[in-house]
C-alpha cells in the first residue's frame, strides 16, 4: 500500500511538471477581457485546483 501512495505521488508530480513544461510562451501580450464574466475565471480555476488537491490528499490519507 505504501508503494502505491509513493507511485501515485510521483505520477502526480510528473504530470504537473509535464503540464507546466508544455505551456507555450506567447510573444505578444494578450488583449484585455471584454466583459466582467472573464474576471471570475481565475477564481474558478483556483477552486478546481483546490478541489483536486483536496481529493488527492484524501486519497493518500
From Swiss-Prot:
Lipid attachment of type GPI-anchor amidated serine occurs at which residues? 35
Tissue spec: Expressed in pollen grains.
Q: How does the record describe the protein's post-translational processing?
A: Contains 4-hydroxyproline; hydroxylated on Pro-29, Pro-31 and Pro-33. O-glycosylated on hydroxyprolines; noncontiguous hydroxylproline residues are glycosylated with arabinogalactan.
Does Cell membrane count among this protein's keywords?
yes
Question: Residues where 4-hydroxyproline occurs?
Answer: 29, 31, 33
Top-level taxon: Eukaryota
Q: Indicate the residues removed as propeptide on maturation.
A: 36-61
User: In what way does this protein cross or attach to the membrane?
Assistant: Lipid-anchor; GPI-anchor
Q: Where in the cell is it found?
A: Cell membrane
Kindly indicate where the leader peptide sits in this chain: 1-22
Q: Which GO terms describe its cellular component?
A: plasma membrane; side of membrane
Which UniProt key words apply to this protein?
A: Cell membrane, Glycoprotein, GPI-anchor, Hydroxylation, Lipoprotein, Membrane, Proteoglycan, Signal
Principal cellular location given in the protein's record: membrane
Sites carrying a glycan are 29, 31, 33
This entry's comment on induction and repression of expression is:
Up-regulated by AHL16/TEK.
Work out whether the entry's keyword set contains Glycoprotein: yes
What the entry lists under InterPro entries is as follows:
AGP23/40
What does the sequence similarity comment in the record state about its family? Answer: Belongs to the AG-peptide AGP family.
The protein's role, per its UniProt record = Proteoglycan that seems to be implicated in diverse developmental roles such as differentiation, cell-cell recognition, embryogenesis and programmed cell death.
> Any idea what this protein is called?
Arabinogalactan protein 23
Which organism is this entry from?
Arabidopsis thaliana (Mouse-ear cress)
Taxonomy, top ranks, is: Eukaryota, Viridiplantae, Streptophyta, Embryophyta, Tracheophyta
Provide the gene name from the record: AGP23
Amino acid at each position: 500500500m505504501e508503494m502505491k501512495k509513493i507511485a501515485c505521488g510521483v505520477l502526480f508530480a510528473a504530470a504537473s511538471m509535464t503540464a507546466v513544461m508544455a505551456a507555450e510562451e506567447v510573444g505578444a501580450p494578450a488583449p484585455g477581457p471584454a466583459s466582467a464574466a472573464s474576471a471570475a475565471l481565475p477564481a474558478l480555476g483556483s477552486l478546481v485546483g483546490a478541489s483536486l488537491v483536496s481529493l488527492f490528499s484524501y486519497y493518500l490519507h
